[in-house]
Amino acid sequence: MSEIFSGIGFDAHKFGDKKGAWIACLEWPESLACEGHSDGDVVAHAICDALLSAANLGDLGSNFGTSDPKWAGVSGANLLAEVYNLITAEKFKIQNVSAQLIGNSPKIGPRRDEAIAAISSALSGARVSLSATTTDGMGFTGSGEGLAALATVLIAR
């Protein structure tokens, strides 16, 4: 009988001054890019943290720290694939991934299916759902200073 483990992840980044954001493993050329050591993909990073949390394998910082130049500029898709390898090495299987982008822009709806496919591909075909919300003008996402994402996962072993 399999044991089920749940994990939660969160990430937030402020916008920089250049266009070409990476969000949910897709490039959004007209959106401001998020600043960060990697590509600033808040959705991918939140999913990574949720998976690592569920497997009790630490978090992004402890596995892919900013002090290691190897991870500078790395894509969210590559981080997801690395995390997938870490959790499958411990005999975990992903049951479900659910992520939510928090911010005013870009609007995920028109590219939701494409984003789900990209995230799922990075996780070797895992079941993924993606939604988005705003904070009705409140906080740094509401004022347009950046983006955040929340993710929950279920994994089994």
Residue ranges and their predicted role:
Residues G109-P110, G137-T141:
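Short active-site-adjacent structural elements
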Residues L123-A126:
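Beta-rich strand-turn-strand
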Residues L130-T134:
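Pyridoxal 5′-phosphate
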Residues S2-A118:
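RNase III-family endoribonuclease catalytic core
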Residues T141-R157:
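C-terminal edge-of-domain segments
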